[in-house]
Amino acid sequence: NAPTTKTLRPCREESVDFDNTQNLYIEGDNLDVLKILRENYLGKVKMIYIDPPYNTGNDFVYNDDFSQTSSEYIAESGQFDSDGNRLVLNTESNGRFHTDWLNMMYPRLKVAKDLLSDDGVIFISIDENEIENLKKICDEIYGAQNFVSSIIWERAFSPKNDAKYLSDSHDY
């Protein structure tokens, strides 16, 4: 959890009623932003909701610090071959599939814990790919005694005929 040297700058021209609003929209690398927020909101946040990448093998590429535009990054990063085929993914075959995802999540959850008030809560959306691993690191960071429940919601109503009274069409 190294400190960040980054700062937040308001975009007044892109804001609606900037001087009177009590809300913030923040865009940037979420780990850097969390570290910046920690400076002023340490122990003050009542609720955090995060919806991280689900680690399906095709939903994101690691180590993007967003210091370049998307097109610059894609052009310079070697993610695609000359035919436009993606070369860099966190695929299950790379041998570090779960480890890469957990290494991305762990520092973010640690900083998020610093933001939470004593009676604060965190909600995390996830699917079946990483729910067990996410539960383990959350137990380590937040304490297993603080876990309340997994909330299961149906993504889309689509009754299946392959299992009587059971459905696998849900997220957590």
Predicted regions and their residues:
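DnaQ-like (DEDDh/DEDDy) 3′-5′ exonuclease domain used for proofreading
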Residues: 1-49, 54-107
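Beta-sheet entry/capping signal
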Residues: 22-24, 44-52, 119-123, 131, ...
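Short acidic loop-to-helix transition motifs that present clustered carboxylates
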Residues: 31-33, 131, 155-159
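A short acidic (Asp/Glu
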Residues: 36-37, 59, 132-137, 161-163
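Short secondary-structure boundary/capping segments
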Residues: 40-42, 61-68, 137-143, 165-169
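Active-site donor-binding loop signature of nucleotide-sugar glycosyltransferases
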Residues: 64, 153-155
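Conserved Class I SAM-dependent methyltransferase catalytic core
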Residues: 81, 88-152
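Polar, glycine-rich mid-to-C-terminal structural blocks
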Residues: 156, 163-172
